[in-house]
Amino acid sequence: MAARLAAVGYEVAVGSRSRYKAMEIVDGLKEKWPNYDLKLRACNNIDAAIFGELIIIATPWDSTATMALSVSDHLAEKVVISMANALAKVGNEFEPLVPPRGSVAASVQALVPRARVAAAFHHLPARELGDLDKPVESDVLICSDHKSATQAVSEITAKIPGCRPLDSGSLANATTIEAFTAVLLQLNHRYRTRSALRLTGINLD
């Protein structure tokens, strides 16, 4: 996600608990995509939260709450995107888990109430997202209790080639959006493909 946003002109801070780990990630992305002017900077998590006007928490779902709390002092009034899916591998299938608040995104909003949390980017196929030479070709369902957050996330989503942002209502809908990821993963396994979400019948013109 960091490389995708940098590729369309955003200056992106990549955060990690260790700045040196973030430097390894940034250096790796720049080496992989030398033909792109990727404006990436390596930071520890706190410095990344201070730098960013919009924050994307891209940790595994069971680390999302800890991450949000660790930088909570720097998230007030900022748009915070939760893209985690609470899933468990059971046999050959992934099954959705429902956190106490109903979704990972709602849990983040409860922990950092002064932030404007949005749920987004749950269904983007990772390989396509990471291939900067090709469009992603996916709809992005965005939900939030803050209209300004939905608008901000929609604006950056629309700049990613192939992505179409869709306002999917309040944060209560994050429960279903996160859980549906398990269905897509099962389809990928069953049909040996990499599926993405594309809805018909919606005209944004």
Model-derived segments and their meaning:
Residues 1-30, 159:
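NAD(P)+-binding Rossmann beta1-loop-alpha1 motif at the extreme N-terminus of oxidoreductases
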Residues 80-102, 119:
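Conserved Rossmann-fold NAD(P)-dependent oxidoreductase catalytic core, especially the SDR/UDP-sugar
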Residues 93-101, 131-148:
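Short beta-strand and adjoining strand-loop segment in the mid-core
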Residues 33-79, 86-92:
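Rossmann-like NAD(P)-binding element
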